UniProtKB/Swiss-Prot annotation:
One of its GO terms (molecular function) is immunoglobulin receptor binding. It is a lipid-anchor; Peripheral membrane protein. The modification Phosphotyrosine is found at Y34, Y208, Y412, Y523. The modification Phosphoserine is found at S218. The lineage of its organism: Eukaryota, Metazoa, Chordata, Craniata, Vertebrata. Residues 77-138 form the SH3 domain. This is Tyrosine-protein kinase Fgr. GO terms for cellular component: actin cytoskeleton; aggresome; cytosol; extracellular exosome; extracellular region; mitochondrial inner membrane; mitochondrial intermembrane space; plasma membrane. InterPro entries: Fgr_SH2, Kinase-like_dom_sf, Non-receptor_tyrosine_kinases, Prot_kinase_dom, Protein_kinase_ATP_BS, Ser-Thr/Tyr_kinase_cat_dom, SH2, SH2_dom_sf. Interacts with ITGB1, ITGB2, MS4A2/FCER1B, FCER1G, FCGR2A and/or FCGR2B. Interacts (via SH2 domain) with SYK (tyrosine phosphorylated). Interacts (via SH2 domain) with FLT3 (tyrosine phosphorylated). Interacts with PTK2/FAK1. Interacts (via SH2 domain) with HCLS1 (tyrosine phosphorylated by SYK). Interacts with SIRPA and PTPNS1. Interacts (not phosphorylated on tyrosine residues) with CBL; FGR tyrosine phosphorylation promotes dissociation. Interacts with PIK3R1 and FASLG. Interacts with CLNK. It catalyses: L-tyrosyl-[protein] + ATP = O-phospho-L-tyrosyl-[protein] + ADP + H(+). Its EC number is 2.7.10.2. A lipid is attached at C3, C6 (S-palmitoyl cysteine).
Length: 529
């Protein structure tokens, strides 16, 4: 028999839903999460290309740095001489080992994330990760060029430890095509450490300027000038912002469905209802996280179909799916995040010391990842702190997206299951199986309470049945201790009973990113008197 709160479970899974798009699904609360390990990791570049979900074979994946320096194949048109931005150690016999500054001729760039190249220094030929190189003498090859990152992400990186006053970066303009923005770390007695932003405008006849008094032929010339004199800026440009080596896009060329023997499970990081999470090594070379699923947890065929969609979802705030072992027991191989789940992190001493600005920033990162999923018409279905992972510099990434509807266990059925995460689930999803991006918005509001309370279970003192009965009548959790009224108001907006009245993730991202700066100008004037 079903529980009292399961009034009507509507039909589940249509052809559209099987593709991972919005629809009515059963969900589950993935208890699998793992704990800390002192391993450094940096988020990969943002993936801007929107896939065609109905045609996996035709995907063209565009590395994050590519813009005006993009090569257009090896027919002699475009740039073919590239330079390494980072060191790289070969992972397979087909890879090239190389060091930062090494130059290559690109022989074949038609297969997405991994290019065939010949090293000019060693003469060897092999595969290289495309996001580890840039065209020689291009702006993308400069250490201070960070490409397509937003204002808030620039602030996160510049304010991270190791950057002095005057640390800077150049990024693409968020509003003007072909223009750039300069972000500089500054300090004063009133605000302490903070970041100021300047627009780098482009002249119609070519050239760039911040103030019309001084114009330059290139961005490189502009940077060199302001490293010598501040000329109206808040500070001299002292040094490029520190950068950690990015994740490669995938483990290696053609490393998607991998053999079980290529994975070494080294240490169990966590145990959940349907399997374990391990720290592992792929091919004896690459540290990864491995989720091992108990046989019968989900259909291998259904999992592989969903994984084909999941691997195309690439964003800085989503945990990258590297590879799968598709025969039971299923292995899901992802990038490793050194601090484990957000839920565990909030409860440890470092998490307990976090202050409101840091907590709001972590929420903004989750909202950014969900805004990407919103644009891609993809639903998470189990958004909560246990399914957010934390890396270096308080980087937050969304994990376990898309897996919820594949679980076959009735205990994760909202009608029958004691394990179903009622306290995070929107009423229309819990009562009728209507999972949409708007039910994810509801869950995000609950996640906000987890952040503010440093990992407290939602609706303290109430059981699941009481929660659903009360929520259906319009009950909201009261404002958590220490939570500003304006932030609680945003939570309440996510808990509106009518899903269409809930805000978008795009709005929530903007609200949270600007939460402490909405009264200040985002960019400094170029011409100052």
């Amino acid at each position: 028999m079903g529980c009292v709160f399961c009034k009507k479970l509507e039909p589940v899974a249509t052809a559209k839903e099987d593709a991972g798009l919005e629809g009515d699904f059963r969900s589950y609360g993935a208890a699998d999460h793992y704990g800390p390990d002192p391993t450094k990791a940096r988020p990969a570049s943002s993936f801007a290309h929107i896939p065609n979900y109905s045609n996996f074979s035709s995907q063209a994946i565009n590395p994050g740095f590519l813009d005006s320096g993009t090569i257009r194949g090896v027919s002699g048109i475009g740039v073919t001489l590239f330079i390494a931005l980072y060191d790289y150690e070969a992972r397979t016999e087909d890879d090239l080992t190389f060091t930062k500054g090494e130059k290559f001729h690109i022989l074949n760039n038609t297969e997405g994330d991994w290019w065939e190249a010949r090293s000019l220094s060693s003469g060897k030929t092999g595969c290289i990760p495309s996001n580890y190189v840039a065209p020689v003498d291009s702006i993308q090859a400069e250490e201070w060029y960070f490409g397509k990152i937003g204002r808030k992400d620039a602030e996160r990186q510049l304010l991270s430890p190791g950057n002095p006053q005057g640390a800077f970066l150049i990024r693409e303009s968020e509003t003007t095509k072909g223009a750039y923005s300069l972000s500089i770390r500054d300090w004063d007695q009133t605000r302490g450490d903070h970041v100021k932003h300047y627009k780098i405008r482009k002249l119609d006849m070519g050239g760039y300027y911040i103030t019309t008094r001084v114009q330059f032929n290139s961005v490189q010339e502009l940077v060199q000038h302001y490293m010598e004199v501040n000329d109206g800026l808040c500070n001299l440009l002292i040094a490029p912002c520190t950068i950690m080596k990015p994740q490669t896009l995938g483990l290696a060329k053609d490393a998607w469905e991998i053999s079980r023997s290529s994975i070494t499970l080294e240490r169990r990081l966590g145990t959940g209802c349907f399997g374990d999470v391990w720290l592992g090594t792929w091919n004896g070379s690459t540290k990864v996280a491995v989720k091992t699923l108990k046989p019968g947890t989900m259909s291998p065929k259904a999992f592989l179909e969903e994984a084909q969609v999941m691997k195309l979802l690439r964003h800085d705030k989503l945990v990258q799916l590297y590879a799968v072992v598709s025969e039971e027991p299923i292995y899901i191989v992802t990038e490793f995040m050194c601090h484990g789940s957000l839920l565990d992190f909030l409860k440890n001493p470092e998490g307990q010391d976090l202050r409101l600005p840091q907590l709001v920033d972590m929420a903004a990162q989750v909202a950014e990842g969900m805004a990407y999923m919103e644009r891609m018409n993809y639903i998470h279905r189990d958004l909560r702190a246990a399914n957010i992972l934390v890396g270096e510099r308080l980087a937050c990434k969304i994990a376990d997206f898309g897996l919820a509807r594949l679980i076959k266990d009735d205990e994760y059925n909202p009608c029958q299951g004691s394990k179903f995460p009622i306290k995070w689930t929107a009423p229309e999803a819990a009562l009728f199986g209507r999972f949409t991006i708007k039910s994810d918005v509801w869950s995000f509001g609950i996640l906000l309470t987890e952040l503010i309370t440093k990992g407290r279970i939602p609706y303290p003192g109430m059981n699941k049945r009481e929660v659903l009965e009360q929520v259906e009548q319009g009950y909201h959790m009261p404002c958590p201790p220490g939570c500003p009224a304006s932030l609680y108001e945003a939570m309440e907006q996510t808990w509106r009973l009518d899903p269409e009245e809930r805000p978008t993730f795009e709005y929530l991202q903007s609200f949270l990113e600007d939460y402490f700066t909405s009264a200040e100008p985002q960019y400094q004037p170029g011409d100052q008197t």
